[in-house]
């Protein structure tokens, strides 16, 4: 997946990011390190950008859960706020963790162009926050694998999502 995403970037054009911030989990951090090395961009790992912890469901596919825990999965999909994964992180706790990191990188890298490499749940939460959507509607936001969102943060304006890019299938 990393190579596929990297090859989509024009060969004669370097990205204009000044820093990369990433989840420390390998599927994000490995890609961040590869990009950082390729373009000589510093990389910072921040554990607060890790995916929501799925507890007993961790590392299991939806298909597996439909076989073993269909009722709990349906409740989670219907109302993730009140029905977290068994033994997993509650959505309000996830929100506090991610928004703490989000606020910190906005202060730390004020005025700079940052690439944040993270997971689908984190991206959904940040989009939901930027668009001021209720937390209980988090799962309505589609985040395809290896997609990119461009968020513009300007103190004179509300944050806005200005571009969405998906890796071609």
Label each residue range with its predicted role.
Residues 1-30, 34, 85-98:
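Loop-to-helix element that buttresses phosphate recognition and phosphoryl-transfer chemistry
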Residues 38-99, 140:
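Phosphate-handling substructures
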Residues 14-48, 74, 152-169:
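Conserved histidine-centered catalytic loops in small-molecule metabolism enzymes
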Residues 12-16, 105-112:
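Glycine-rich phosphate-binding loop signature in dinucleotide/nucleotide-binding domains
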Residues 27-29, 51-53, 122-124:
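Short, active-site-adjacent cap segments at secondary-structure transitions
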Residues 119:
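Short basic (Lys/Arg) and small-residue
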Residues 34, 38, 104, 129-133:
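Active-site catalytic microenvironments for nucleophilic, acid-base chemistry
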Residues 52-66, 107-112, 128-169:
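Acidic, low-complexity terminal tails and accessory targeting/binding regions
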